[in-house]
């Protein structure tokens, strides 16, 4: 006699599951092998990053921000210095802007590589994981030569970067670009037309165009659903508008489309790096002068007066944030990374609100999982690309 179980089964996946990409817990309700409900449990890696910012100067806070998305630390550093720069009207030298752009794109490639390897391992293909570590090591060698650190670089500064590029670094980076492009083609030959891979990703976790916009998705999650939205084109920050490159996008909206977008972005990042390395200008790599509106409380100050402040390179609090508010965003590998900064005419920010892309993108996960098979959970979660350091903050 066949005994059937009518009651649904509740399974707790994580926070110590090897495919969880961090300390994420999913409380999954199963009806046989089908997912009936899913409740993500967050907060295991919450460290109060926004509150810490209120008692630190920007320079003192820089080492903390590399612990948000610890696989793409250049972007968290960029947003941390961009917010005070915009608030205080600090002009970044062109050479510093080009150096930042090169570092950001190298960090984007490293982040996408470390997404590709574990994503394929989750599906069951172990080989690409070892391939991507080989190329990622070369990027970390470039970071170490320029910043002194392989991870947690602490390289960006208000008004520029900490140090100039060392002698021979540009040639070494160009050599890496020439080496890396054929490797991306090799990944595609290994993966893209593999019938087992296609069965696991095609038509899985489909997000429509309107749905992606309504959920506030960003980055590859949004562009894989047919929306050509890239902040490097939209906001024209740094010097991206001076280079020739294309926004990678797909219309499928499934896990396969998100894979194709990230593969294409690695190619475009190499194109950006090659152009930037050949066009990088000379000149200073930092500007330590802040040009802000003079306070009306000062005597003899007119409406068009400017007050010049010196930005110290030491952690000592010499740079005051104006009493204004500003929202700054950059196109991180996982989506729109933003900071809403409120200054209070003091060395410390009054409010430092972080808009992490992984946290917003993760909200759609329960809707994607309902009705899918248990084995598809890892595929869909892996295609979102989350890092719990920035999700929990």
From Swiss-Prot:
UniProt cross-references to InterPro entries, sorted A to Z: NADH_Q_OxRdtase_suD, NADH_UbQ_OxRdtase_49kDa_CS, NDH1_su_D/H, NiFe-Hase_large
Catalytic activity: a plastoquinone + NADH + (n+1) H(+)(in) = a plastoquinol + NAD(+) + n H(+)(out); a plastoquinone + NADPH + (n+1) H(+)(in) = a plastoquinol + NADP(+) + n H(+)(out)
Domain of life: Eukaryota
Topology relative to the membrane: Peripheral membrane protein
PANTHER family, per the entry: NADH DEHYDROGENASE [UBIQUINONE] IRON-SULFUR PROTEIN 2, MITOCHONDRIAL, NADH-UBIQUINONE OXIDOREDUCTASE 49 KDA SUBUNIT
UniProt subunit comment: NDH is composed of at least 16 different subunits, 5 of which are encoded in the nucleus.
Protein name, UniProt field: NAD(P)H-quinone oxidoreductase subunit H, chloroplastic
Source organism (scientific name): Zygnema circumcarinatum (Green alga)
Gene: ndhH
């Amino acid at each position: 006699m066949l005994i059937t179980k009518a009651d649904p089964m509740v399974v707790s996946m994580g926070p110590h599951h090897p495919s969880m990409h961090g300390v994420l817990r999913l409380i999954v309700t199963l009806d046989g092998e089908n997912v009936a409900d899913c409740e993500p449990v967050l907060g295991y890696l919450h460290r109060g990053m926004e509150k810490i910012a209120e008692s630190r100067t920007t320079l003192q806070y820089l080492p903390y921000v590399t612990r948000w998305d610890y696989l793409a630390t250049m972007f968290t550093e960029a947003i941390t210095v961009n917010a005070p720069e915009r608030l205080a009207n600090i002009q970044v030298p062109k050479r510093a802007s080009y150096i930042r752009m090169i570092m950001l794109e190298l960090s984007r490639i490293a982040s996408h590589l470390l997404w590709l390897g574990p994503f394929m391992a989750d599906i069951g293909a172990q080989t690409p994981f070892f391939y991507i570590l080989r190329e990622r090591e070369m990027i970390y060698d470039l970071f170490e030569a320029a910043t002194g650190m392989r991870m947690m670089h602490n390289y960006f500064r208000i008004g520029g970067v900490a140090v100039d590029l060392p002698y021979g670094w540009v040639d070494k980076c160009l050599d890496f670009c020439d080496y890396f492009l054929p490797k991306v083609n090799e990944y595609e030959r290994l993966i893209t037309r593999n019938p087992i891979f296609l069965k696991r990703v095609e038509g899985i976790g489909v997000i429509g165009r309107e749905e992606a916009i309504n959920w506030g998705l960003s980055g590859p999650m949004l562009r894989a659903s047919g929306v050509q939205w890239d902040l490097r084109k939209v906001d024209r920050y740094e010097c991206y508008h001076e280079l020739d490159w294309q926004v990678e996008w797909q219309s499928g909206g499934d896990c396969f489309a998100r894979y194709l977008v990230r593969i294409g972005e690695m190619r475009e990042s190499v194109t950006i790096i090659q152009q930037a390395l050949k066009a990088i200008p000379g000149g200073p790599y930092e500007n330590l002068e802040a040009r802000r509106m003079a306070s009306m409380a000062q005597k003899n100050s007119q409406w068009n007066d400017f007050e010049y402040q010196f930005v110290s390179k030491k952690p000592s609090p010499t740079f005051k944030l104006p009493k204004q508010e500003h929202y700054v965003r950059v196109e991180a590998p996982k989506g729109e990374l933003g900071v809403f900064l409120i200054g209070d005419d003091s060395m410390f920010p009054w409010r430092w609100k972080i808009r992490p892309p992984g946290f917003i993108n993760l909200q759609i996960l329960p809707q994607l999982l309902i009705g899918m098979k248990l084995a598809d959970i890892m595929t869909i979660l892996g295609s979102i690309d989350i890092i719990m350091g920035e999700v929990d903050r």
